[in-house]
């Protein structure tokens, strides 16, 4: 991931992560209008930061729902002022990051701390140290540190993913796989997550490439994506019927 070339007339990139090993496109697995119209209905709010949150009611149970579409900046106390009470009174949490292309790695690791009660190794990375193909440093641990003020580590949580969960969102997924209260539901994530580096060629074109490589706690690289604990596909027919199969699976799991 994070490999592209930028010229004055075109940007070149590799988007093969959207195609599976059989040459088929991964399903979209996301429709925000279906979520707002059929699940949240009028019980949701979108913050200026772009965070959408609300409540989903099912069979007498109430679950908090949060959609986060990008890790461009840290959550503010104003965000938490409205979101924390919704999470606290809910019986469980659906944290949806489908179609999240990433953003700040620091923001991702900070937010992951909401789901841990103690400092936890969530993966490893190795830094590129030379020109050779295998010139990398020794593996260095990556940690998630628990949030003191906003901790949801005791809240049963479903993390929703699809193939368009990329970069920092992929790293966030890797982190939450280590949280005891979190289950990943949906499709395999899109991969990526390494720190992009830049270099200008003599002709002025810009090349972007990863400066490190990321691994999970089993020391398996995550550049090709992270498999969900519960794999679910939402079809076009599902969405046309006002149904999100991934949310439905998450609700079933929350009610167990």
Residues covered by each model-derived region:
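Active-site-proximal beta-strand/loop segments in catalytic clefts of secreted hydrolases
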Residues: 67-71, 96-100, 125-128, 160-164, ...
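Extracytoplasmic/secreted proteins, especially bacterial periplasmic and envelope-associated proteins
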Residues: 78, 82, 106-110, 167, ...
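Extended C-terminal subregions enriched in glycine
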Residues: 156-178, 183-190
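Terminal peptide-recognition signature
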Residues: 66, 95, 157, 176, ...
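Low-complexity, Gly/Ser/Thr/Pro-rich intrinsically disordered linker/tail segments
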Residues: 228-256
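Gly/Ser/Thr-rich loop/hinge elements
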Residues: 102-160, 194-200, 211-222, 227
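Flexible, low-complexity junctional segments that flank or bridge functional domains
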Residues: 1-123, 156, 200
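C-terminal soluble interaction/assembly domains
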Residues: 177, 186-202, 207-209, 228-232
């Amino acid at each position: 991931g994070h490999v592209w070339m930028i010229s004055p007339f075109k940007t070149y990139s590799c988007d093969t992560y959207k195609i599976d090993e059989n040459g088929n496109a991964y399903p979209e697995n996301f429709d925000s209008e279906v979520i707002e119209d059929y699940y949240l209905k009028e019980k949701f709010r979108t913050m200026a930061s772009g965070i959408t949150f609300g409540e989903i009611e099912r069979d007498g149970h109430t679950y908090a729902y949060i959609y986060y579409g990008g890790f461009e900046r840290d959550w503010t106390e104003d965000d938490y002022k409205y979101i924390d009470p919704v999470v606290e009174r809910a019986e469980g949490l659906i944290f949806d990051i489908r179609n999240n292309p990433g953003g700040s790695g620091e923001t991702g690791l900070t937010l992951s701390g909401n789901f841990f009660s103690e400092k936890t190794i969530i993966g490893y990375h190795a830094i590129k140290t030379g020109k050779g193909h295998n010139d990398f440093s020794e593996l260095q641990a990556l940690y998630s540190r628990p949030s003191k003020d906003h901790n949801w580590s005791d809240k049963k949580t479903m993390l929703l993913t699809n193939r368009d969960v990329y970069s920092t969102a992929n790293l966030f997924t890797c982190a939450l796989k280590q949280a005891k209260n979190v289950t990943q539901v949906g499709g395999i994530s899109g991969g990526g997550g390494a720190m992009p580096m830049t270099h200008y060629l003599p002709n002025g074109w810009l090349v972007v490439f990863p400066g490190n490589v990321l691994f999970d706690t089993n020391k398996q690289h995550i550049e090709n994506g992270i498999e969900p604990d519960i794999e679910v596909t939402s079809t076009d027919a599902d969405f046309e019927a006002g149904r999100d199969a991934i949310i439905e699976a998450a609700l079933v799991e929350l009610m167990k």
